[in-house]
């Protein structure tokens, strides 16, 4: 009678779901107030003109216009929303 001694249970096999971070609106795309542009942990991107930053560092549009990514000082990337001509009138 062949028997096998019971093996121990594995302590692996768990993983957390992805957090869905990253760029949601890219440069040149249209944005309206409240649109989320970037979800991030910490400040990979910094807020520029026409955008705000939430408690969790989410960058969102505060004006209607086009999204722009621009390099700034110290290697920082700033995100702005430039008002479109018809939105400014």
From Swiss-Prot:
GO terms for molecular function: structural constituent of ribosome. GO terms for cellular component: cytosolic large ribosomal subunit. InterPro entries: Ribosomal_bL27 (IPR001684), Ribosomal_bL27_CS (IPR018261). This is Large ribosomal subunit protein bL27. Belongs to the bacterial ribosomal protein bL27 family. Signal peptide: none annotated. It holds the Pfam family Ribosomal_L27. It comes from Cereibacter sphaeroides (strain ATCC 17023 / DSM 158 / JCM 6121 / CCUG 31486 / LMG 2827 / NBRC 12203 / NCIMB 8253 / ATH 2.4.1.). The lineage of its organism: Bacteria, Pseudomonadati, Pseudomonadota, Alphaproteobacteria, Rhodobacterales. Keywords: Ribonucleoprotein, Ribosomal protein. One of its GO terms (biological process) is translation.
